[in-house]
Amino acid sequence: MSGDASAELLRHLLAQRYGHEVEVPEGVAGLPELLHIAGQSSHRAWSAAPVAPELVKLLAACALAAPSKSFLQQADIIDVRDAARRAAIHALVPGMPWMADAPALLVFCANGRRFKHLFERRGRPFTNDHLDGFFHPSVDAALVMMNSINAAGAAGLVGCPISMIRNAPERLAEILELPPRVVPVAGLCLGFPAQARQVNPRLPLAAT
């Protein structure tokens, strides 16, 4: 696709998304990547094609390159492959049948344990035992999940985040055998799309 055609398609996608035109500067680089980001939608219908563990590992390696608060790297990705664990997690959110059918299920965790462990290794008292100990790892986990969605899209996959796994965090932590201070933030179903999705509207840019 030519640069002019890509720019026109990007303008069209953004107008669909926001209900108004967004200027695409002439000569802007990275139009294919911008088109992918502008056209994102959550998917809940998967093809029968499996998602190989090797592909998930590659996506995780790309996703974990996301920015991290103070380089502490307080986010983890769990690739839930065990059928019994998948069933137990799905039982926590039974109103989502498409979750059970997803070829891959990832759980993104805020890891507040890693920072505390650094203090323990040096024999020092932990001085950050307050809200930041949860907030910063949660932001790290969110950044890693968004990177995962972008990486998956680049590989031809689609996904849908699942916040409802937090409805029973203690039970989910038990299913995943998480240590203390490692908190599940969100799930992400991944698969190859069974069909195209429409662009979902967003508030106008002026609203932000």
Predicted regions and their residues:
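Acidic, surface-exposed loops and disordered segments
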Residues: M1-T208
